[in-house]
Amino acid sequence: MSDEPRTPTVDLDGERAALARARDAVQAKLGALAAIEGGGADALADEYIDAVVRGTIEKLQQELVVFGRIDDDQPWRIGLYGIDRDGEQLVVDWRAPFAGGFYRAGFDDPMGLARRVSYVGSIDDLFVEELATGEVTGSSPLLGELARSRGTEMRAAVATLQSEQDALVRLPPDATLVLRGGPGTGKTVVGLHRAAWLVYNDRRLTAGRILVLGPSDRFLRFVSAVLPTLGEARILQTTFDRLLGPSTAAGSDPAWLDALDRFEASLLAPAELRVGLTRIREADVAAAAERASGRAIPWRDRRKVFTSVLARAHGLAAGDVSKAARDVWPPMSAAAAMRRLRSPSLLRTLGLPTDVIAGWTAAPADGALLDEVRARFEGVPATYGHAIVDEAQDLSLLQLRAVQRRSTGLTLVGDDAQRSGAHGLGLRRAAAQLGVAPAEMATAYRMSAEIADWLNAHAARHGIDAVHLVGIRPTGVAVRELVGSAEQHGTAIAELDGRWANVASIGADDAWSHKGVEYDAVVVDAAGMDPAAVYLAASRAAHELVVVHPAS
């Protein structure tokens, strides 16, 4: 193939005209929506409709509706939203099954397509791939996106999703995904775009039934624009602490699960019952208790089963049996159970380790433990159809169980090399707990190849459980390692500030709060950091990295 620039094989005037028709169709639809102003059931409905219309108009004025095209026997334009007029599909929603060819077709497998066209920033700059002949014209939109300066917010990657990412985004709605991805591989992109894809493709899921959990407010601010850009602003994005309350090391210990089993068993005291003139033998009471205890339902519901079994067997009113059986199977709320579980002597009887008892009795509360107790004694409804957890390597077993209870579908994404909590399961163990095999992504899209290579070497040197990164973007800018003073640190920051818009200085006091966020350049003050924290801090850099080691 010649290295000479080739004339694009796409009619630019035709593309402009197609885009104009699509925009006209959008405006016509929005005009129709605006025409129903005042037609809601009440003032609140009117206000909501007006807000939706205004927000959509503003979005369409800012966003390029169409970002690419695939051709079979006719051109099909791909965009953020599907647009049709008079039965003609002007734009195909990127989430539609047919649009998968835009992301996954290749020269080895064209998927029945003749051509793929990507708009690189504007309709005048095209990247054209002739899938039948292997000819390419223009510059890759992916490389252009990766080379740009990083802003203070993550951008939607809908125009540049790669084949491996798209395949994970489009997994069936009922699939459980556990994704181990190294830094810069796009695991967060996969999670957020999967959320938007699920709303479009699973009629059981509305945006209000999808939950996105992130590690921190800093992370949520960073990704806050992605889902609104994809048209799904109503998906709840929050932290685990905000959802359930803070967790503690002592309250996260997996030993609690066996201890709670023993606690429940200790509450049962089968004995002979007298209900009015009727005597119920201890053996019958014990058999009913055993039958009810085997049900995977909360304590209060098992107690109802227990009393109902005895009532039916002896021709009694269930309410009378319930009153008589208060000492045999006591009613117990989650709050009452938690009060009992504050007793060190009881906890020792239940077999909790001494350090867990000491930590727990000194802790004010624990969100995940309280949720576990509430689920066992009162029940927790499945509020969401799908939960997507970022930085999921830090979930404790109790936190994972809490997320599972709230959602019928689950996507976990993270990086075991960035595990910060002692009780974090890690993604391999989380996958085993869920009964699935973890997927893995290793291509370092976001960062330079030099930074990826430095991270690989650092992880190998210190025995960090990291995905081995594959760098695809060499820049010729080596990672700088300095040994020295605060003055050198300040000089490095000043130099990078002169070249990049978004520079971070990360030290031991705030390293973990930067998890999931990215910057153009990073200066790592390694003083007081362990190797894992250095890895985390260094992996935030996209283009340049300076590591300042303390003088020995």
Give residue ranges: language-model regions.
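Catalytic cores of large soluble enzymes that bind and process phosphate-bearing ligands
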Residues: S149, E153, S252, P298, ...
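Short secondary-structure junctions and interdomain/linker hinges
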Residues: V26, L33, E164, L168, ...
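Conserved helicase motor core of SF1/SF2 NTP-dependent helicases
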Residues: A156, L205-G208, D217-L243, T248, ...
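Non-catalytic, well-ordered alpha-helical scaffold segments
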Residues: L64-F67, R155, D166, D217, ...
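Alpha-helical nucleic-acid-binding subdomain
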Residues: V128, A196-I388, Q393-R405, A417-R419
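Extended, charged low-complexity regulatory segments
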Residues: M1-A167
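Short secondary-structure boundary/capping elements
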Residues: T160, V190, A365-A368, Q488, ...
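P-loop NTPase Walker
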Residues: S2, V10-D13, L19-A22, E129-T137, ...
